[in-house]
Amino acid sequence: MVDATVGHGGHSLLFGRSLGPEGILVGLDIDPPSLERARERLASLTCRVILVKSNFACLAERLGELGIEKVDFILADLGFNSAQLADAEMGLSFRTEDMPLDMRIDKSLTTTAADIVNGYDEKSLADLIFEYGQDRASRRIARYIVRRRQQERITTTGQLVEIVCSALRTPGGKHRPRKHPATRTFQALRIAVNRELENLDRLLATAPKLLRTGGYLAVISFHSLEDGRVKWDFKRNQQEGVYRLLTRKPIVADPKEIAENRRARSAKLRIAQRN
């Protein structure tokens, strides 16, 4: 099996226990600290464990390098772990201490969130926040960003939170019901910096070529842009006779799981089987 986003190894540990000594588990992650945590966590498994530093967009290339042509199961959990959200160097969160406005999971990428915020023109910023953040106030937010950067370079998450809150006339220390005002802007920047949708599209396009007949593709998404892509891809492949859908509607977390893990409230699981 392939865990395309191995993270700290939680999913891999669960599935790896059922593989046995003859099984092979390949785990990919672009974040080195996550790979080290996974290596420690999966050490007790009896199956062969291969961990690779790579984005799942390059899954076909990585499997080719390992001499693996077909697999029985591909799992992709598109969420972030708590350690990444708390990592000051990544600057992914607006809820923790003031962080550098970076947002790169893969440090080999050259463009940071600060580069976008300080470099894009107002229209491009507004379009990005609207398309990737789905924020109807995108033009107003972009206007406030441009106004602030004319005074000083925007380099920290705290600065950006303050700007967005000002644009939405929300005091920096208060949240609107259920969702922080900066949520959508941060989502848009994170998606753009890490090329998340482009990478997901590449994985979805590659999966049918890698799965054996009867093999499974399972994707856990966390916002509508991801889920919409997965839903469309699964439906198209079903119509073309490539997949059989095992989830007509996405599987979502029950109240007990949400109580234990608040981020699970946004998770949607879709599963397809290769014909």
Task: Tell where the protein language model's regions lie, with residue ranges.
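S-adenosyl-L-methionine-dependent methyltransferase catalytic core, i.e., the SAM/SAH-binding region
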Residues: 1-275
